Amino acid sequence: MKALFLVLAAAMAAPLVLGAPKDEKTKSTRWKITGQLEEACSCNAACPCWFDSKPTRATCGGNQVLFIQKGNYGNVKLDGLAVANYAQSPENQTMMDSFGKWNFSTNYIDEKANPEQRKALEAIAAAVLPSNNGSKNFKTVYVPITRKIEGKDHVITIGNVATFTGHLVEGGLGGSSKITNPPGADPLHHQYAQGKTTRMIYNDSDQNWDWTDTNYMLGTFTLDSDQYAKFVAGLAQKMAKKEKTESAEKK
């Protein structure tokens, strides 16, 4: 976990000052987004990776898709846009401990976005997902990103390379089943409703996925740059405390 804290802190801090649109290149471009998270992966539900456990298959391959209802990056409006990331862990390793060594990480930016909005979405994705630091095998693609809600089913389509359909599962006491503050939680995943996919297909990044009845998660979010700055600071404090404890134990 030591390596994880160091990598995540560096990964999330950098986008707070880099990647700003031309007229927003300052040390503290502030941003805020509100919307919904659609997420699915190859693991059986619920995905154990959020508990720093190994995936239920040889690898965990999955996505995070942000549908922004309202947002801005500095003066750049992001209302109605979307951004997604697909990634996969190495075999027999957790997503958390293998961060930086993932088999691949691919960002998908809403093609509706203009050039300034694309740069803004890329910067936010790097902070929130954080996608471009997860793997040396990284690329960004501009595609249509859509969602249809058909009864209980949420159908998400990423260009012509990916689609998945998910639905929530009922909790034992009624209502939807929710997971709150798992060990791997970040501001985006402070709480999410648990579900399962009907089907998940992905044909890009040298992959050919076609799975059914796997992990699906649905969340709502209101995120901003101040929140992530505090999150990074918190990771740094945890790292310092951990190093101090380990140093004392060696004496």
Predicted regions and their residues:
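Positively charged n-region of N-terminal signal peptides that target proteins for export
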Residues: 1-5
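Bacterial N-terminal signal peptides
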Residues: 7-15
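Cleaved targeting-peptide boundary
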Residues: 17-30
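Beta-strand-enriched cores of mature, soluble protein domains
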Residues: 27-250
